From Swiss-Prot:
Protein name according to UniProt: Zona pellucida sperm-binding protein 2
Membrane side Cytoplasmic: residue ranges: 686-695
Keyword field contains Transcription: no
Site residues by UniProt (Cleavage): 156-157, 619-620
Membrane topology, from the record: Single-pass type I membrane protein
Primary gene name: Zp2
Transmembrane segments: 665-685
Extracellular side: 25-664
Span of domain ZP: 353-616
Disulphide bonds in the chain: 40-123, 73-91, 354-447, 385-406, 527-597, 548-613, 602-609
GO molecular function: acrosin binding; identical protein binding; structural constituent of egg coat
Domain of life, source organism: Eukaryota
Tissue localization of expression: Expressed in oocytes.
Subunit structure as annotated in this protein's UniProt entry: Can form homopolymers that assemble into long fibers (in vitro). Polymers of ZP2 and ZP3 organized into long filaments cross-linked by ZP1 homodimers. Interacts with ZP3.
């Protein structure tokens, strides 16, 4: 039985070797006496006969296993191209793994048929492509391991023979795909392992196609993998993606662990540790803060971390066990697991040098030990010296002790004068089931002077300071819009684009920022509107020219004085724009409008501050153009016509304009009707008078 299984497997292997990976057409030539080639297509079988074959003499037909012609088989025979086509369902016999094809080629002139006239073929069943996604990805420093389910057990029996047969590896980085046959991939360090349970592919971290991202000392790489296997009748695609962060930069201070993630196309959505998974919008509330400049930095409060004794450190070490980072990468949610840990840290921070005025400064952090220190029990030496600052909730105590007090000792080592003391503290809430070798915390603190150091006092006589050179600084102007004429609160940047309808005025203001000088004044030069964000783009609608209403505009801009309560009213320029100004017969209504203004700052006494409207000449302020500054609205304004279906509640000012126009129109119509009645009545009297005269 095993021998026949071996023969069947070798037969399948033969088909795999002669079949193209991407083609579904399988040429069959089992019977060399057959005068043609049989091709197994996806939907039908095609037989191509030799051009020397006499189709009329040799009549090909499809028969069953007994040699009888299949009655319901409908086939197409092209005598000119020497091609025979027929479907699988009605013209073949379905067997395990495919279809049996029996073709009889018989001389039509012969009276007797022979058994050797029937030729037998086999077409494997064409199966749909199978897609498998790996859920087991293991990141290591120098390779990534992908595991996939085993779909064909016989491959495990001949792993050495089939490992390079029909396999293609594709590695992508989002923009380019690198394709390798398995035999070439193995040479480059890839490894494919197949057993009865799974298929495992090892991809080197330095393989072509793996994308690497580095920032400072942080290192991260991403892999997009496709492993393809093709054999007659089937095509299997194993796919997976991975984000690996084998070496992220970790920095720890007294209160936080900081983790640096290089900038790459993925976006971090959540972090998980222990039994917790914390989404981005809940980080701050759970003791995690982020910085999103030049990559991403996460700051974890140390209360979230675990501690462990370490042979490398004299004190306990803070760490995360299996910190899971979940990213949105290329439309998929991918996770990577890391184990960051803080370097060895001391619960006491001390300046190496003693202070110049004869003191030793150091800080004690209660949470740098396990259990934490009880700051209330802190002692320095054998004295009662207290810290100058202590907050139990922050876990911090700061000392400033004299070198000639609090039990500080002095000694000489080489060229240094060393001052040292010892601090004592009790543990805070130690667990009852743990026996401590020491009942209290003890640590020696020290600072030093260089032995030949000498404190000098000097008086340095300096020259008088130079006179400051005064020049105007850069201007800071802003252009804003307001909901109404009260100019109470401008629209914020996130409220753009704004929506306005025809007949609604747009209230604008140009303001000087960060200037308190009452002697300066803001003067508008030009204001205009464009359909693009660029102030220099065309077309343009002029709103203000040389500080005056644009004379060619049918709907003039109206200026508004700043309130008397406003500080430095000369620092403001307020006006409203009529939306009719942006409608013309040739252009129609532009739905998206950007506004821009150029302005200058001048001294109140300067002639430049005097604006006469209408401006007599365009070159009135040409000499001052270098001092102007162009500002734009934070965003565009969408203009809608009156009949827009999206129009909501009408603005009160708009309503008044509409009501005024309607009343005037109604009055005109009434006057016209009245005139017609009067003229008709006069004509009637005149006609009646003529009739009387004739009679």
């Amino acid at each position: 039985m095993a021998r026949w299984q071996r023969v069947y497997w070798l037969r399948s292997l033969f088909f795999a070797l002669v079949t193209s990976v991407n083609s579904l057409s399988l040429p069959q030539s089992e019977n060399p006496a057959f005068p043609g080639t049989l091709i197994c297509d996806k939907d039908e079988v095609r037989v191509e006969f030799s051009s020397r074959f006499d189709m009329e003499k040799w009549n090909p037909s499809l028969v069953d296993t007994f040699g009888n012609e299949i009655s319901n088989c409908t086939y197409a025979l092209d005598l000119e191209k020497f091609i025979l086509k027929f479907p699988y369902e009605t013209c073949t016999i379905k067997v395990i793994g495919g279809y049996q094809v029996n073709i009889r080629v018989q001389d039509t002139n012969a009276d007797v048929s022979y058994k050797d006239d029937v030729h037998h073929f086999f077409c494997p069943a064409i199966q749909a492509e199978i897609h498998e996604v790996s859920e087991i990805v293991v990141c290591m420093e120098d390779l990534i391991s992908f595991s996939f389910p085993q779909l064909f057990s016989r491959l495990a029996d001949e792993n050495q023979n089939v490992s390079e047969m029909g396999w293609i590896i594709k590695i992508g980085n989002g923009t380019r795909v690198h394709t390798l046959p398995l035999k070439d991939a193995i040479v480059q360090g890839f490894n494919l392992l197949i057993d009865s349970q799974k298929i495992t592919l090892h991809v080197p971290a330095n393989a072509t196609g793996v994308a690497h991202y580095v920032q400072e000392s942080s290192y991260l790489y991403t892999v997009q993998l496709k492993l393809l296997f093709s054999s007659p009748g089937q095509k299997i695609t194993f796919s997976s993606q991975a984000i690996c962060a084998p070496d992220l930069s970790v920095a720890c201070n007294v209160t936080h662990m900081s983790l640096t993630i290089p900038e790459f196309p993925g976006k971090l959505k959540s972090v998980g540790f222990g039994q917790r998974n914390i989404p981005e919008d809940q980080w701050h509330a759970n003791g995690i803060d982020k910085e999103a400049t030049n990559g991403l930095r996460l700051h974890f409060r140390k209360s979230l971390l675990k501690t462990k004794p370490s042979e490398k450190c004299p004190f306990y070490q803070f760490y995360f066990s299996s910190l899971e980072l979940t990213f949105n990468f290329q439309g998929d949610m991918l996770s990577t697991v890391i184990d960051p840990e803080c370097h060895c840290e001391s619960p006491v921070s001390i300046d190496e040098l003693c202070t110049r005025d004869g003191f030793m400064d150091f800080e004690v952090y209660s949470h740098q030990t396990k259990p934490a220190l009880n700051l209330e029990s802190l002692l320095v030496g054998n004295s009662s010296c207290q810290p100058i600052f202590k907050v139990q909730s922050l876990g911090l105590a700061r000392f400033h002790i004299p070198l000639n007090g609090c039990g500080t000792r002095q000694k000489f080592e080489g060229d240094k004068v060393i001052y040292e003391n010892e601090i004592h503290a009790l543990w805070e809430n130690p667990p009852s089931n743990i026996i401590f070798r020491n009942s209290e915390f003890r640590m020696t603190v020290r600072c030093h002077y260089i032995r030949d150091s000498m404190l000098l006092r000097a008086h340095i006589k300096s020259h008088s300071s130079p006179v400051a050179s005064v020049k105007p600084g850069p201007l800071a102007l802003v252009l804003q819009t307001y909901p109404d004429i009260s100019y109470q609160r401008p629209y914020r940047k996130n409220e753009y684009p704004l929506v306005r309808y025809l007949r609604q005025p747009i209230y604008m203001e140009v303001t000087v920022l960060n200037r308190n000088d009452p002697n300066i004044k803001l003067v508008l030069d030009d204001c205009w509107a464009t359909t693009f964000e660029d102030p220099a783009s065309v077309p343009q609608w002029q709103i203000i020219m040389d500080g005056c209403e644009y004379e060619l505009d049918n709907y003039r801009t109206t200026f508004h004085a700043a309130n008397s309560s406003a500080a430095h009213s000369g620092h403001y320029q307020r006006f409203d724009v009529k939306t009719f100004a942006f409608v013309s017969e040739s252009r129609g209504l532009s739905s998206l409008i950007y506004f821009h203004c150029s302005a200058l700052i001048c001294n109140q006494a300067s002639p430049l501050c005097s604006v006469t409207c209408p401006a007599p000449l365009r070159n009135k302020r040409e000499a001052s153009k270098e001092g102007t500054m162009t500002v734009s609205l934070p965003g565009p304004i969408i203009l809608l016509s009156d009949d827009s279906s999206s129009k909501g509640v009408m603005n009160p000012d708009s309503y008044e304009i509409t009501k005024d126009i309607a009343s005037k129109t109604l009055g005109a119509v009434a006057a016209l009707v009245g005139s017609a009645v009067i003229i008709g009545f006069i004509c009637y009297l005149h006609k009646k008078r003529i009739v009387r005269f004739n009679s």
